[in-house]
């Protein structure tokens, strides 16, 4: 499936982009925000990502001409389109999105209007890149079953109990942060 990369600090919009990607049925490619621009270029290109959600400050340090496979780049601050490949109509689509939503859902968008893509849990849903201490990062393909196994482990070992509080400093793009936060 299509791959969608996400890079930025932990925040609600990062989670929205991540969850929207996997519930759409695409493969999410989380990238650690402290990777240098050269590593980010490599990961986006190597993963064959077609969209990138990024913080504005990270985008300011990337070279769009090195990201030729991307169809578009979106800001994690407000989801506006920061860049689109020539010939794409994403900005035009976004300008009319509110009108389209009002026309399609005249009574408003409700919970029952949500329909998730049905995918087998053995399909790759996450392409997580290592820190690359011995060269460029390597992509690790994880399926729904891999992630469900982490949740099952946490439940069986009573990793957390009702009422527990957690202070996590790991980025959501980190393998552990992504699996357990």
Where is each model-derived feature located?
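Structural core segment of the AMP-binding/adenylate-forming
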Residues: 23-100
